[in-house]
Design a protein with these regions (language model features):
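Conserved mixed alpha/beta catalytic, RNA-binding, or beta-rich assembly cores of soluble enzyme
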Residues: 102-108
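Structural signature of WD-repeat beta-propellers
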Residues: 20-21, 64, 71-72, 109-110, ...
């Protein structure tokens, strides 16, 4: 079994970064296709096939130092871009995705939660649960705000530094 998601690839720094079912993340050379490294974002856990689904569910996000990814029923984790060394990992579950800026990694978690983690340490900075149990889109950064859509047709605007919901508008 795999999670139906919009997982994709990210091209950056002469490499292709891609997440796969089973919680794997790989970096391959864009020039010759050679595998640079392969890491585990999240290990499958549980007894049943449903419990063991830990697919990387969105495109990895990349900056000059790190590549970060999130797995369904698993973890959000960041790795060194050059060799795949794990920098940090935290328990999280997302079928929507994540994004990052210079300070934080933002994750749309299950059950309508948006969370921010410190980019360097993985420390939890804030969680916004006021959006209820809505199905949320992958987060997008717009200036000092995090934007997420929901399954009721609303666009939600959160402050990036504390997660406060500052605006909500129907589409």
């Amino acid at each position: 079994l795999t999670v139906r998601s919009t997982a994709g690839i990210t091209l950056a720094h002469g490499a292709v970064f891609a997440g796969f079912p089973g919680g794997k993340l790989v970096a391959m050379s864009l020039f010759n296709g050679n595998l640079g490294w392969e890491v585990t974002v999240s290990q499958p856990r549980g007894v049943t096939e449903l419990e063991r689904m830990t697919d990387v569910t969105s495109s990895p996000v990349v900056n000059n130092q790190f590549v970060c990814a999130v797995a369904y029923q698993g973890r959000v984790a960041c790795f060194a871009i050059n060799d795949g060394t794990q920098i940090w990992a935290r328990e999280a579950s997302s079928s929507a995705g994540l994004t990052m800026d210079n300070d934080y990694v933002y994750v749309t978690e299950e059950k309508g939660i948006v969370a921010a983690y410190d980019l360097l340490s993985g420390a939890g900075m804030w969680k916004q649960s006021r959006l209820g149990s809505k199905k949320l889109s992958s987060p997008i950064i717009r200036g000092q705000y995090i934007v997420v859509g929901d399954d009721q047709g609303y666009v939600n605007l959160l402050r990036n530094y504390d997660g406060v919901l500052v605006a909500r508008s129907a589409t």
